[in-house]
Structure formats: structure tokens, C-alpha cells
């Protein structure tokens, strides 16, 4: 239907069109100077030292795990309440994902759950900054340091998120996403930030065939013809067309996130009169990027199941999302780990629903969602 309200829509405008035209007019549309500008901009945003642009956050996770040497016999700790790409990359490298539970109300992985899962085979910890809020990084990094285990932050939801006064990605290694529904987007893309120069060099090589130089060489104005393959790598570089869009979006980040926050505040106010339960906010100091606004639909409390609510909203022309169905309940992982039970993850996986939230959402759009929720709740 023409008036269908999606749960997300990218906020594009004249700036993005102009950025694309500039790249097209330049004659260099693949990885080039716009990538370097984007990487420098993300270093400024996060306060970290190095950044490597990639074709997706999944690609970034893949090469980050590879750069750590993750492989057969290794274990990687991650919440099950995450998108399956992280699990898939761990498995495809021959390692074992060790899925842990999350806090029932924030959906954040906790240091207690992580520590209980650590074994001599643990080679990485991947906390997820969920829905735009940060995980408890001080406690998680303290665990990593105590046990000598690297931490890779899944910051796909966290562009604009801060933890105790510092932007996510200010230290260590973090991976951001520019997918179409994210706070800033270039359709598909991602970036890895890190404070380790050797690690950054490995990422840069692995993302471009394993060559010893990046896809763009600053001195020659293109890839050095004498570049050699140092180790087998992938084709995960980001075209400048995408990088230019991401740069234009990044300049709008504060305004885009401010609008998201305003809509989230309206949702919170409206939920006081509805039976649906929003996620709780973390207790530590933070700035929320409001990538998602998630409610829990408990049939005993709401008189309707989550799936029935989503179906009813769809008949009213309103889209919703599910972020996420727990990874360990997916067919492959359910069959591989048949005895795994994560009670708080499973409770939420059956009840969570993402409501429409995007910067161009109007007051009329918002009113439409709230009216529909009241109708469904029988109010």
C-alpha cells in the first residue's frame, strides 16, 4: 500500500546526491580518497587512532576475527541476542560460538555471563551495544585484561552512542555498520576502528585480497602495480560511491540522532498508558543513539502475542521489526547446540518488537502508531 509506514527509512537528501555526483564526476568510483576521508572522520568521531572502511560490518567482523587468528578449536563468546552474522563468521572460521544470556530488561550481555563462559579455549569476547545503548565496557574490558582475551565491540547499533563520556569505539576495537536501517547509512558498508596499528594493517590487507597495500595508494593515486599478496584475503573494500554517502550522512549525525531521541521520548511517554514494555536503560552514564525502539509484548500482560501484534499492525499499514530472534533458536544453531538454554534471551526473543523509528518520521506517523497500539490493546 502506498501509505505503508515502514519501521525504518533512510534519511537522504540533496547532500547525499551531491556527494555521489562529485564521485561520479571524479572518474574514480571505487575505493579511493573518499574512503580515506571517511576513515579520518570516524577517528575524529570516536577518538580512536585507526579506522578501516569495509563493505559491511559482517565483513569487518570476519577479518577482525581472522586478524586475531581465530580458527579450529577456538571459542568466541557472544550473546545469542544478536544478528546471526557474528555467529556465522565464527563458525565459518572453524571456531565455536559460545552463546551467553543477557540482562532481561536491557538485553545487554553482562560481565557475569561472560566470565562464567570463559575457558582456556576462549580467544575473543564480542559484546553487543544493543539498540543504540552501550554495554558495560569498563567491566567487560577488565575481564578481557584479567584473562588476556581480546574484546571486539559489535557497535553496529552504536553510531552516536557514548559510554561514560566517550564515544563507543574510543578504545580497543569496534565495528560499526552503515546498513540501510542504521543511524547513518550508505546502503551497505561498515568501518572498524582500533587503537592497534599492526591490527589495522592486517585488516587493511585482509579486506583487499591480502595485498600489502590498501586498495588506494596515496602516493600513486591508485593501487601500486607491484603490490604482493602477503596472505590470502577477501574483496571487502568499500567503493567511494558508498563512502561519499556515509560522509554526507555523518555530517548530519547529531541532527539525525536528536530526532530519533525525540521520537523515543514520545514513545516512552505514550507507553505509560499501554501494556507494552519498553527496554530498560542501562544504569551507567551514557548517550543513547536510539537505533531501535523496542517493546516487549507479553501475552499475559497485553492480551496478545508479539506475532499477532505485528500482524495486526501490518493490516493497519504499519511496519515493525524483530531484533532479534535469538541466534541459538535458528535451525542450524538449534541443531548444533540442542541443549543450550538461555532463559532471559528466550523470553525476550518471543516478545520483542521494534516499532517505527527514523528521522523523517512525522508527528502524524507517530500518532498513527500510538492510535493503532491503543486499538489493539482494546483501549
Curated annotation (Swiss-Prot):
GO MF terms on file? pyridoxal phosphate binding; UDP-4-amino-4-deoxy-L-arabinose aminotransferase
Annotated pathway, please? Nucleotide-sugar biosynthesis; UDP-4-deoxy-4-formamido-beta-L-arabinose biosynthesis; UDP-4-deoxy-4-formamido-beta-L-arabinose from UDP-alpha-D-glucuronate: step 2/3; Bacterial outer membrane biogenesis; lipopolysaccharide biosynthesis
Q: What EC number(s) does its UniProt record assign?
A: 2.6.1.87
Cofactor names: pyridoxal 5'-phosphate
Which HAMAP family does the protein's record reference? ArnB_transfer
Q: Which NCBIfam families match?
A: PRK11658.1
Q: How does it assemble?
A: Homodimer.
Q: Quote the protein name from its UniProt record.
A: UDP-4-amino-4-deoxy-L-arabinose--oxoglutarate aminotransferase
* Gene symbol of the encoding locus: arnB
Amino acid at each position: 500500500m502506498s501509505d505503508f509506514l515502514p519501521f525504518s527509512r533512510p534519511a537522504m537528501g540533496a547532500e547525499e546526491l551531491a556527494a555521489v555526483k562529485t564521485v561520479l564526476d571524479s572518474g574514480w568510483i571505487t575505493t579511493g580518497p573518499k574512503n580515506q576521508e571517511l576513515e579520518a572522520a570516524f577517528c575524529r568521531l570516536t577518538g580512536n587512532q585507526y579506522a578501516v572502511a569495509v563493505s559491511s560490518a559482517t565483513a569487518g567482523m570476519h577479518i577482525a576475527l581472522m586478524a586475531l587468528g581465530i580458527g579450529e578449536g577456538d571459542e568466541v563468546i557472544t550473546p545469542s541476542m544478536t544478528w546471526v552474522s557474528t555467529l556465522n563468521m565464527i563458525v565459518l572460521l572453524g571456531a565455536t560460538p559460545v552463546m551467553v544470556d543477557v540482562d532481561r530488561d536491557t538485553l545487554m550481555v553482562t560481565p557475569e555471563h561472560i566470565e562464567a563462559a570463559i575457558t582456556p579455549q576462549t580467544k575473543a569476547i564480542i559484546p553487543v551495544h544493543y539498540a543504540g545503548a552501550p554495554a558495560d565496557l569498563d567491566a567487560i574490558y577488565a575481564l578481557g585484561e584479567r584473562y588476556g582475551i581480546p574484546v571486539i565491540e559489535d557497535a553496529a547499533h552504536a553510531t552516536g552512542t557514548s559510554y561514560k563520556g566517550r564515544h563507543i569505539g574510543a578504545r580497543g576495537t569496534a565495528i560499526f555498520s552503515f546498513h540501510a536501517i542504521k543511524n547513518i547509512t550508505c546502503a551497505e558498508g561498515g568501518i572498524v576502528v582500533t587503537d592497534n596499528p599492526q591490527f589495522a594493517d592486517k585488516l587493511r590487507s585482509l579486506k583487499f585480497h591480502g595485498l600489502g597495500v590498501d586498495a588506494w595508494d596515496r602516493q600513486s593515486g591508485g593501487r601500486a602495480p607491484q603490490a604482493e599478496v602477503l596472505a590470502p584475503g577477501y574483496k571487502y573494500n568499500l567503493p567511494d560511491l558508498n563512502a561519499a554517502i556515509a560522509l554526507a550522512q555523518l555530517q548530519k549525525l547529531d541532527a539525525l540522532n536528536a530526532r530519533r531521541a525525540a521520537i523515543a521520548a514520545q514513545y516512552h511517554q505514550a507507553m505509560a498508558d499501554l501494556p507494552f514494555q519498553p527496554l530498560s536503560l542501562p544504569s551507567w552514564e551514557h548517550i543513547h543513539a536510539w537505533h531501535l525502539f523496542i517493546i516487549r509484548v507479553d501475552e499475559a500482560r497485553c492480551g496478545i502475542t508479539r506475532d499477532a501484534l505485528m500482524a495486526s499492525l501490518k493490516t493497519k499499514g504499519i511496519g515493525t521489526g524483530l531484533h532479534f530472534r535469538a541466534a541459538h533458536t535458528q535451525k542450524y544453531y538449534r541443531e548444533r547446540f540442542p541443549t543450550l538454554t538461555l532463559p532471559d534471551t528466550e523470553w525476550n526473543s518471543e516478545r520483542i518488537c521494534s516499532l517505527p523509528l527514523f528521522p523523517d518520521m512525522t508527528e502524524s506517523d507517530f500518532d498513527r502508531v500510538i492510535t493503532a497500539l491503543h486499538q489493539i490493546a482494546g483501549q
